[in-house]
Amino acid sequence: MKRTLDIGVLLSRSGMYAALAYASRLGVLQGVAEVNADHTLDVAFRVVERDPEGRLDRYAPLCREILRDSQARHIFGCITSASRKEVIPELERFGGVLWYPVPYEGFEASEHVAYMHACPNQHLIPLLDWALPSLGKRAYFVGSNYIWGWEMARIARERVAAAAGDVLGDRYIAVGDTDLDHIIQEIRALKPDFILNSLVGDSSYAFLARLAELKQEAGFQSGLTVLSCNFTECEVESAGSAAEGLVSAGPWFEPEGGSGGSFHEIARQSVHELAKLLHGRPGADVLPLSELVQSAAGSGHTPRLDPTNLHARQPAIIARLLNGRFQEIKRLPPLAADPYLTRQFGASHDGPLLKVVS
């Protein structure tokens, strides 16, 4: 006999990054359907959903509403780091947990967040370690003007400097902004070996379109490779052919040409992981996340999350978009998350060095 538990879903169905949220939402709903149909599990989930509509000011109130007005203590959602940080105080107030299924910039370890996707030692650093010897050492950074863009550029700048490279430019625009003339003009003048694109949603699609036009000019046909740690299959339709040749890093790419990418797949896996953590353990949904993970490990389940920092171990895959599909270039085996970059990438020690504190 299954027991039914409320879970929250806090993902935008509209707004400037709707394609990303759409893929994650479908992944969550698929995971719920699979868990509810799995008779080997004694839990089923009932979805309590709220739509922030891509507006940052709606995330915290809607998170509060889910936690206050339902029995849900676990919420799946948020796409941007700004929205994640908005809801953490509400999670702390009500004892909730956010299952965060998308890549982020690291330098965070909340007791109330399950970081299921990749952090920089699992995406950005492997990507740069491939790019610098393969493409050249003259880099240009462009990103959305919030913590994701800032931190990705900061970490990348340090990595480029360590390789004796140069950062030719480091520019930011507001999320959703598509006024890119000054950036395109600068790239035309500087001719970098590669561009790290940390733009989000509509801004990224507009940038790729403008860059595709620039590549038609003499002297650019064979250069201007774009790197990304947040572009997946779920954005290929929105970006169109302008994204061709983009090189992305992540823990999972569609093996047979699907359109959801890792945003869909990690969201789906996250629902399954929660179900396994709660299976056979009535009342465990109200436990602190680290305690839930540790106690499940003691019951025979091997958790996806490291109980010391609540980040998932993930492989690092580098792939290039060709003919609308990502083709793998390089794959590293699953890496323990190092959200604060407290150890050198590639060092022999691969165990956690941090402990989550509430």
Task: Give the ranges of each region predicted by the language model.
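Extracytoplasmic "Venus flytrap"
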Residues: 4, 8-29, 50-54
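Beta-alpha junction/loop-to-helix N-cap segments that form part of ligand/metal-binding clefts
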Residues: 24, 39-106
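Short beta-strand elements in bilobed, periplasmic/extracellular small-molecule ligand-binding domains
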Residues: 38-54, 110-112, 160-177
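Periplasmic-binding protein-like
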Residues: 69-79, 99-101, 140-141, 191-207, ...
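Extracellular glycoside hydrolase catalytic/binding regions
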Residues: 96-126
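An alpha-beta-alpha
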Residues: 116-171
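Extracellular/periplasmic periplasmic-binding protein-like sensory domains
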Residues: 211-282
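Segments of small-molecule ligand-sensing domains
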Residues: 275-350, 356-357
